[in-house]
Amino acid sequence: MGSAELTARLAAEGLRPGSWANGPGDVYAAHVHAFDKVLVCAAGSIVFGLPGRGEVAALRPGDRLDLPAGTVHEAVVGPEGVTCLEAHLPAGALAPPPLRRPAGEW
C-alpha cells in the first residue's frame, strides 16, 4: 500500500495527514503532545517506545499507531529510514490506551 492510498484512507476518516521522513538510526527522545496523534508508516520502519506503559510498537509500511494526548513516547528509526504520515486531533478524540493497528486491520 503506497503513501497515496494510505493518505486517502486517513482522509476517509476525516483526517488531514502531513508527512515526514528521517534517516536510519535517527532518535526521538521521550516526549508528549497536548493533542492526539495518528501515525502511519508509509515506508521503512520505526520503533516507538511507550516508557510509561513498558511497551514497544514497531511500525512497518501500512501499520498505524494512535497516540492519545499526554502519552509519553520515544522512537528510533529503522536501518532503511522511515517515511510517516501524521495527523493531529483534539485531545480526547482518541480513547486511551495507545493502539497499534497492523496494516490491513484499519
Predicted regions and their residues:
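A generic structural motif
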Residues: 49-51, 76
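Short, conserved beta-strand element in jelly-roll/cupin
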Residues: 32-48
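Short acidic-glycine-tyrosine-enriched beta hairpin
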Residues: 53-69
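Histidine-centered metal-chelating micro-motifs
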Residues: 27-28, 65, 69-74
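Conserved short histidine dyad/triad with adjacent acidic residue
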Residues: 16-33
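Double-stranded beta-helix
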Residues: 1-19, 74-106
